[in-house]
Amino acid sequence: MAASLPLPASGLFRTYGAAGGGRPRRRQGLAAVQWFPPQDRKRFFSSSSSDTSSGGPSQSVVSDDPDDPDFPGSPVGQRRRRAGARLAKGRPSQIATPRRLRLRSRCPQKCSTPCGALEPPSFPNGNPGSLSPDLRVCGQPRDGGELGTSASLFSSLASPGPGFPAPEDSICTDPSTFLDAASEAPSNFHLPEASLDQAPLPCSQDAATGGGRFTRLAHQAQASLRSALFSFLDPGNPEDSELGTDGKNLQEFCHDRELVGRRLESPGLSGRGKKRTTDQDSCREIESQESVQIEYEEARGCKGGIASGKSNGPERTRLSRKRKHQGTAETSLLHHCQVTKGQKMEDGSCVTQDLTRLQNACSWTKTRASFSFHKKKIVTAVSEVCSCDTLAGSLSESLMSEYSHHPVQNRTSCALSPWHSSSMYLLTPLKTQQVTDKRTSDAEKLYGECNQVGPIPFSDYLSEEKLECCEKIGEGVFGEVFQTVTNHTPVALKIIAIEGQNLVNGAHQKTFEEILPEIIISKELSLLSDEACNRTEGFIGLNSVHCVQGSYPPLLLQAWDHYHSTKGSANDRPDFFREDQLFIVLEFEFGGIDLEQMRKKLSSIATAKSILHQITASLAVAEASLHFEHRDLHWGNVLLKKTSLKELHYTLNGKKSSIPTRGLQVNIIDYTLSRLERDGIVVFCDISRDEDLFMGQGDYQFEIYRLMRKENNNCWGEYHPYNNVLWLHYLTDKILNQMTFKSKHNTPALKRMKKQIQHFYQTMLNFSSATDLLCQHSLFK
């Protein structure tokens, strides 16, 4: 039996990757299966069940998919049954992973793929729940298991994580090699910290009632249990499919989950029955059980077991008022239960480990689809978001710049064509509308955005000439991304299946209602390039949207096959769609290569300064125009492309300015978690109960999620532009600590510029918004 694989690294939130693996299994017509917990709760705490080829503990995501890269544990023998228990009929035996498999070339991994390092990131201060003041903690390990954020150029259409997908992506290219971390940030600077605590109670309409409070406590208990239990879940054979390769394990799968689902109703999770773990691992099992018990009691309001203390926010030099509803933050004990196994690997199991890494990376996108990462946007009126009392006590209220208070402008003249004018009015909630009428209304709105009266055939939109030059360049749970040429200009086509019954890459297809906000958000930010009062070209351009019908064109399937044979695909081959299947095709401009892949390719630190300047200006314009927060601006969502322009121009509140390009233009993508507002309508993604998103470790990206939650007190409908500052701080950290430049800092000008960026890094958290930074900070003077 092959040796167990190590515990996973921090699972970073991504939509797709270029990792290859075993050929994806096609599951035509597979209906969604209701979630049921597995039967044997002893599997929750088996220390051998948490092993994988990645290098550190991961509690960012929970999964019931045996292909989950966070939990592809060691081969498992037949499960012992308890005395008096009935033996399930027709239960197939589990087969151990073969010791040797044929060698396959390893596809390059992006540092956001959950694989690599064989140990969890070290925390010099001894507290795994927070980041060390030393900025080098955020660096990447040297063995290829980097813990950077998602490098995807496109994100799937619905999710928080990282997120859910959004249709605002562009072109993806091959990933670059991994980078050895080099920390050059000031040693005396303290990173902002937000403890791995329970979330503040999410703001909702039931908050004022006793029933609402009970509901929130129940949700917290469920989230805590889910995160703890499935972090230690034994998935069995990592090569098996979600319900068995041939579907024969479906009955056992659902039966096991149903039994454990009943047991989880009570807090009595302490071990009963025989143990499957070794003596060496039994103490870890008991510790894990006690942690889950404490988490359960904490969610129910039980006293004792957890020491409470106030979590510290970013350090400011100015005064700020205390939050009215500031509560104590309790550090979760789940993160103290993380362990790694130093088992010796035989020569033959190295091949298995390499192959499993590829399979794990490919299944990561399907994992996200199974656990609340693909939610629809919430559309509501400004007056219905959380109370202004919470906003008044936010971390940054006392620092709000005068530029942040300008009302959202009525920006676009209604005399323009529909595609060149705002469509936010289409999202106005109609509470009195019937369900059937609403679906028809949503379809009509979408067809209106497409300038169609109904779906058109694939061939009417994609001519034979366009199809012949199509090349697949990216993918996600949402679907596929192809590059083609339109009017002698390269464009990216994002193809998303909608309104169908079949699962697509493990996720339900979106409806007209769910896809419409994604389209309109991309359109609103793209339209900022045409505005007068607040103008920027820093957001990816959306050229057109079409709704097509039919099966996948053969030439696109050929492009899909070529991508799979050269890079490896995590998606199912899209050949199972019927003739009546609907697709949304979003045509984006060419966006370039993401910052993560360019981390070794930039010419000098001066180029990095231009990148920071362009991103800050784009966010500032979006703040002034749309009260915009990106909320997931990791370096995989920053695209760079070459430009011959010496300067880029933007307009903020009527004032025109320019930025030196240094030969590169920045495009921001992926509005999955974003929040924007216009004409009294707010569109946002409510992640208040997605506890797994806030429990990641090993990268500064995870700390940003927690700091955002602390800033807005877990009310995600509110406007808090300070969240944009937090993401700019994250990007500056990446530039200083994890990027290398072709030209070293050997000239006085470059040395002076590096010191300016270091000063920017040290002082930027004292500013209230991207607008405040752009107008007031010395780096941009």
UniProtKB/Swiss-Prot annotation:
Modified residues annotated as Phosphoserine in this record: 58, 93, 132
Domain Protein kinase: 467-781
Matching SUPFAM superfamilies: Protein kinase-like (PK-like)
EC numbers, comma separated: 2.7.11.1
Pfam families: Haspin_kinase
Transmembrane intervals: none
A GO biological process held by the record: mitotic cell cycle
SMART domains assigned to the protein according to its UniProt record, in alphabetical order: DUF3635 (SM01331), S_TKc (SM00220)
Binding sites annotated in the UniProt record for ATP: 473-481, 494, 589-594, 632-637, 670-672
Stored InterPro entries: GSG2_C, Kinase-like_dom_sf, Prot_kinase_dom, Protein_kinase_ATP_BS
Enzyme class: transferase
Activity regulation behaviour: Constitutive activity that does not require phosphorylation. Specifically inhibited by 3-(1H-indazol-5-yl)-N-propylimidazo[1,2-b]pyridazin-6-amine (CHR-6494).
Compartment(s) where it occurs, according to its Swiss-Prot or TrEMBL record: Nucleus; Chromosome; Cytoplasm, Cytoskeleton, Spindle
Function as written in the Swiss-Prot or TrEMBL entry: Serine/threonine-protein kinase that phosphorylates histone H3 at 'Thr-3' (H3T3ph) during mitosis. May act through H3T3ph to both position and modulate activation of AURKB and other components of the chromosomal passenger complex (CPC) at centromeres to ensure proper chromatid cohesion, metaphase alignment and normal progression through the cell cycle.
Entry protein name: Serine/threonine-protein kinase haspin
Species, as recorded: Bos taurus
Origin organism lineage: Eukaryota, Metazoa, Chordata, Craniata, Vertebrata
Gene name, Swiss-Prot/TrEMBL: HASPIN
